[in-house]
A protein has these predicted regions:
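Walker A/P-loop nucleotide-binding motif
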Residues: 127-147
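Short glycine-rich substrate-engagement loop in P-loop NTPases that contacts/grips substrate
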Residues: 111-120, 128, 151-191, 203-210
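A short, basic N-terminal segment
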Residues: 1-107, 269-287
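Loop/turn-to-beta-strand initiation segments
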Residues: 159-160, 190-193, 222-228
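Walker B catalytic acidic pair
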Residues: 198-199
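Hydrophobic/aromatic beta-strand patches that form the interior of the parallel beta-sheet core
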Residues: 133, 162, 195, 227, ...
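Pre-Walker A (pre-P-loop) alpha-helix and adjacent loop at the N terminus of AAA/AAA+ ATPase modules
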Residues: 93-133
Length: 287
C-alpha cells in the first residue's frame, strides 16, 4: 500500500463523499478508507494511475472475506468430492451388496483383515510399485469381503476402483465388434485399482480365455495394480493345465502377492444365522 500523503488523503475524502457502505463496513478516520467492522481490515485501497496523474480506489477483500471465500470454496470442493465418490461407487461397485463390504461391517473374526487395512493405508506405495494381491482359498473364507473392504475404503478416499468378475466382463463383451471390445478393455485403465472377483468360475472356452488374457495383459502392461480373488489353489495357478491358462496366471503371479485364506467358512456361519432368524420369525406367535 502506498503512503497516504496529504494530496492522496484529499483525493480519498473527495471520493468518499456519498459512498455506500455495507452494514459490516465503516470509513476509518485514520486513512479515510473503507474497513471491515469485524476484523478491522481494509476493504478499499489506493492505487496510482500509471502513465498519468491521479489515483483510483478499488475494492479489496479483508481477512474475514478471504476466510469466508476459502470456506465457501472448501465446502464446494467437499460437495464435488462427495458427488464424485458417489458416481465412482456406482461405476466401480456394480453389485449393490458390495456397498456393505466395509471395515465398519467387519466382525473381527478374520485376522487377515489387518492386511486389508494395511494395503489401504499404504495405497500410494502399492500404486507406485504396482503391487497387487492374489487372494486364494476355499469357498466362503472371506476373500470377496476382504477385497470389497479395500475397494470401499479407497473409493471413500476418492481413488477410482472397479470391482467386477469375468462372467460380467464376458457378458458385456458379447456382441461387441473387435474395436469396441478393445476400447472396453482399455477403459479399465481409468481405474487405479482393478479387482477381479472369483477367477476360475467362468467357462474356459477359447473365446473366454482369449478375452480374459486381453484384460489381464492390458492391466499388466498399464502397470496398475489389480487384486484377484479365486477358489483355485496356488498349485493350480503355478501349474496351469495349458498355455492359455499359463499366459494369464503367469502375469497374475508376477504382479500379485498371494495371501492364503484358510479359515472357517463364513458363508456357512451366515447361512446358519439366517436360518435361525427365519425360524424365529415363522414360529413367532401373533400378538
Amino acid at each position: 500500500m502506498i503512503e497516504i500523503t496529504a494530496e492522496i488523503r484529499a483525493f480519498i475524502d473527495k471520493v468518499a463523499v456519498g459512498v455506500e457502505l455495507a452494514e459490516d463496513e465503516y470509513i476509518d478516520p485514520s486513512d479515510g478508507l473503507i474497513h471491515c467492522k469485524k476484523c478491522g481490515g481494509q476493504r478499499q485501497t489506493v492505487v496510482p494511475c500509471f502513465g498519468k496523474s491521479g489515483y483510483f480506489m478499488p475494492r479489496c477483500i479483508c481477512q474475514c472475506q478471504q476466510e469466508a471465500e476459502e470456506q465457501r470454496k472448501a465446502a464446494e470442493e467437499r460437495k464435488r468430492r462427495m458427488e464424485r465418490i458417489k458416481r465412482r461407487k456406482a461405476q466401480g461397485l456394480q453389485d449393490r451388496y458390495l456397498y456393505d463390504y466395509t471395515f465398519a461391517n467387519d466382525n473381527g473374526q478374520n485376522p487377515l483383515m489387518d492386511k486389508a487395512r494395511a494395503y489401504v493405508e499404504n495405497w500410494k506405495e502399492a500404486y507406485k510399485n504396482n503391487t497387487g494381491l492374489l487372494l486364494f482359498g476355499d469357498v466362503g473364507t472371506g476373500k470377496s469381503f476382504f477385497a470389497g473392504c479395500i475397494a470401499n475404503a479407497l473409493l471413500d478416499r476418492d481413488v477410482p476402483v472397479l470391482m467386477t468378475n469375468f462372467p460380467t466382463i464376458l457378458n458385456r463383451l458379447t456382441g461387441m465388434f473387435s474395436e469396441d471390445r478393445a476400447d472396453f478393455i482399455t477403459s479399465f485403465d481409468e481405474y487405479d485399482l482393478l479387482i477381479i472377483d472369483d477367477l476360475g468360475v467362468e467357462r474356459s472356452t477359447e473365446y473366454a480365455m482369449e478375452q480374459m488374457f486381453f484384460v489381464i495383459d492390458s492391466r499388466y502392461r498399464s502397470r496398475r495394480p489389480m487384486i484377484i480373488t479365486t477358489n483355485l489353489k496356488l498349485a493350480e495357478l503355478k501349474n496351469p493345465p495349458d498355455l492359455a491358462h499359463a499366459r494369464i496366471y503367469d502375469r497374475i503371479l508376477e504382479r500379485c502377492a498371494p495371501i492364503l485364506f484358510a479359515g472357517k467358512n463364513f458363508r456357512e456361519e451366515n447361512a446358519g444365522a439366517t436360518k435361525q432368524a427365519a425360524k424365529d420369525i415363522v414360529n413367532r406367535k401373533s400378538e
